[in-house]
UniProtKB/Swiss-Prot annotation:
UniProt membrane topology term: Single-pass membrane protein
Major place of residence: mitochondrion
Pfam families with a match to the protein in the record: ATP-synt_8
One cellular-component annotation, GO: proton-transporting ATP synthase complex
Protein location: Mitochondrion membrane
Keywords: Acetylation, ATP synthesis, CF(0), Hydrogen ion transport, Ion transport, Membrane, Mitochondrion, Transmembrane, Transmembrane helix, Transport
Organism, as annotated: Rhinoceros unicornis (Greater Indian rhinoceros)
Origin organism lineage: Eukaryota, Metazoa, Chordata, Craniata, Vertebrata
Protein name per UniProt: ATP synthase protein 8
Residues modified as N6-acetyllysine: K54, K57
Length: 67
């Protein structure tokens, strides 16, 4: 059974790591960031629903009187 030749693994892994690092740096350098990030005001509106104005009670089937 032949032995696995691992003599080129170090060069392969090193060159792959350097290439990925360079590609990532190039990708980040082309990204445009906002110059002055500010929070946008959020407009909240109150919605009135019919059940908000009156009291409601929810009956679960187990709390109903026995028949």
């Amino acid at each position: 059974m032949p032995q696995l030749d691992t003599s080129t693994w170090f060069i392969t892994i090193t060159s792959m790591t350097i290439t990925l690092f360079i590609m990532f740096q190039l990708k980040l350098s082309k990204h445009s960031y906002p110059s002055n990030p500010e929070l946008k005001p959020i407009n909240t509106s109150m919605h009135t629903t019919p059940w908000e104005s009156k009291w409601t009670k929810i009956y679960s089937p187990l709390s109903l009187p026995q028949q």
